[in-house]
């Protein structure tokens, strides 16, 4: 078949497959365009979790992992897997970056751990914190404080009280550490430059000012939050105090801090807030995006100086802070193979997923490759996306329609965020609206691509919206799933000529694209073309 132009890769974020049910917002939605594409063109299901994407067995996938695997055309072993192995073989306890932080703290200073406290495995894992606490004990650090960020998004909404109780048990077992503050991830892990949220978290961590109150027992604080209808993700930052009502452990000048989140996108902003006076960049972060707004919202003179701030992974290539697990360099990924063939490609997403179709899709490289253009559509300014389930999908469809009509691009990579971002609310009606909005956009894109003689690959990076009710509790499920996702090959006469093989994974998408585009597949790509040519006699 002739090379289609353009080839459009559509990533329906959070659009997994599960049998129809009252918990499946995708099956409950009216989606005539998607259903027709599924009927008229070759399709299969592919894996997006566990060992298929470089995660521990049974671990649900996520957007970062998904886009890395898609763009790399191979299984990319994730930081969680690397850290798990380092704990297992004890190399983590000999890591020089961590030893330097421990040595700094053992010199009469305080050591602070902070990050997402859960077993969700998307941004962090509580087992990593437990290992760090053991290491601090072994290295003679005396004053250790933990500032947990509560999850409720990649875990059940009220599991946080269990995680805090488990943490306190571990601290008693090891004889080290106290919980100093608690913040919902909504505040401490924002990624949309909403500095007012980070201010509430940093006020608790730095100044002992808790908008959510002061508690001797953090479990009591969490339970009171639940009683007010506020679940883990949205817990208003509160401070833990001693018998004299004094904050137990605020971050002070010269302290050591270790952010134990391994996923970068939601660790970046809190790092920018806290490390501005501690060598985050040569210019103290002043050259970074929205630095003036940050300094106006959280004045620089209110931030501690000379922190020994350590990042678990590389949160931003511009940061000059110590890193525990440095990034791998991926070569011969789809992006540089397209560049080598002088192919023009466009990346399109709204704010929430822009980094995924650019930075993560490009193997952790921020700078665009030659021939690569990017179009960012602003996400709506709402507290949570169930309030605006349409998000900016129609704006994305506008961009794609214009780009296809113009005929300037060989490849277009697009992410529709709705099913994932609204699915995280755990609310079925708005998630149905989100799915139906994306379906309408699919119809628009298909019409213009067909008219221009192009082709589409429709898939997802992980599941979410297909499982909105927790089967054990009967309550809302806000986390991703381990379900497979659809993969549809939309092209003229595709159903006559091709079938798609089963048991594929995200690593197979780039090889499939290269097969369609006629680009030789490099040996570094270990995925395989998902197409089976029915016209070739065996």
UniProtKB/Swiss-Prot annotation:
Pfam family, one: Metalloenzyme
Keywords noted in UniProt: Glycolysis, Isomerase, Manganese, Metal-binding
One Gene Ontology term from the biological process aspect of the record: glucose catabolic process
A GO term from the CC aspect: cytosol
SUPFAM superfamilies to which the protein is assigned, alphabetical: 2,3-Bisphosphoglycerate-independent phosphoglycerate mutase, substrate-binding domain (SSF64158), Alkaline phosphatase-like (SSF53649)
Keyword Metal-binding: yes
Catalytic activity: (2R)-2-phosphoglycerate = (2R)-3-phosphoglycerate
Residues annotated as binding substrate: 123, 153-154, 185, 191, 263-266, 353
Name recorded for this polypeptide: 2,3-bisphosphoglycerate-independent phosphoglycerate mutase
């Amino acid at each position: 078949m002739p090379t289609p132009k353009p080839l459009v890769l559509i990533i329906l974020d959070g659009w997994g497959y599960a049998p129809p049910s009252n918990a499946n917002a995708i099956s409950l939605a009216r989606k005539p365009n998607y259903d027709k594409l599924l009927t008229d063109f070759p399709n299969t299901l592919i894996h997006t979790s566990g060992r298929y994407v470089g995660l521990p067995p049974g671990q649900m996938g996520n957007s970062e992992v998904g886009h890395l695997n898609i763009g790399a055309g191979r299984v990319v072993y994730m930081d969680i897997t690397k850290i798990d192995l380092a704990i297992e073989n004890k190399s983590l306890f000999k890591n020089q970056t961590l030893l330097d932080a421990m040595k700094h703290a053992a010199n009469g200073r305080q050591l602070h751990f902070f990050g997402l406290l859960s077993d969700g495995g998307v941004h962090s894992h509580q087992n990593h914190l437990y290992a760090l606490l053991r290491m601090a004990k072994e290295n003679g650090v005396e004053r250790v404080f933990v500032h947990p960020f509560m999850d409720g998004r990649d875990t059940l909404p009220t599991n946080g009280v269990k995680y805090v109780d488990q943490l306190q048990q571990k601290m008693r077992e090891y004889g080290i550490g106290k919980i100093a503050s608690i913040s919902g991830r909504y505040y401490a892990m924002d990624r949309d430059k909403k500095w007012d949220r980070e201010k509430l978290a940093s006020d608790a961590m730095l100044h002992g000012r808790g908008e959510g109150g002061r508690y001797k027992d953090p479990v009591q604080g969490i339970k009171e939050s639940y009683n007010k209808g506020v679940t883990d993700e949205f817990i208003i930052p509160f401070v833990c105090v001693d018998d004299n009502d004094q904050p137990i452990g605020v971050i002070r000048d010269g302290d050591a801090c270790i952010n134990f989140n391994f996923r970068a996108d939601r660790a970046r902003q809190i790092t920018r807030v806290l490390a501005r006076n501690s060598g985050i960049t040569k210019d103290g972060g002043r050259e970074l995006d929205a630095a003036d707004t940050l300094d106006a919202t959280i004045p620089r003179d209110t931030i501690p100086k000379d922190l020994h701030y350590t990042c678990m992974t590389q949160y931003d290539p511009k940061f000059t802070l110590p890193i525990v697990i440095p990034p791998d360099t991926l070569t011969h990924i789809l992006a540089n193979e397209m560049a080598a063939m002088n192919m023009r490609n466009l990346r399109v997403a709204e704010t929430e997923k822009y980094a995924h179709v650019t930075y993560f899709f490009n193997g952790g490289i921020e700078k665009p490759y030659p021939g690569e253009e990017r179009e960012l559509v602003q996400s709506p300014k709402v507290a949570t996306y169930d309030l605006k389930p349409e998000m900016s999908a129609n704006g994305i469809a506008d961009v794609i329609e214009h780009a296809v009509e113009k005929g300037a691009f060989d490849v277009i990579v697009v992410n529709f965020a709705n099913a994932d971002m609204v699915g995280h609310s755990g609310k079925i009606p708005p998630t149905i609206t989100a799915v139906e909005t994306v379906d309408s956009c699919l119809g628009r894109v298909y019409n213009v691509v067909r008219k221009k003689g192009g082709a589409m690959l429709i898939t997802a990076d992980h599941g979410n919206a297909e499982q909105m009710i927790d089967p054990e509790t009967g309550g809302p499920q806000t986390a991703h799933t381990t379900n497979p996702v659809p993969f549809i090959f939309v092209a003229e006469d595709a159903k006559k000529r091709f079938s798609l093989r089963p048991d594929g994974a995200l690593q197979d998408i780039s090889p499939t694209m290269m097969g369609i585009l006629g680009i030789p597949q490099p040996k570094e790509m270990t995925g395989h073309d998902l197409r089976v040519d029915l016209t070739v006699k065996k």
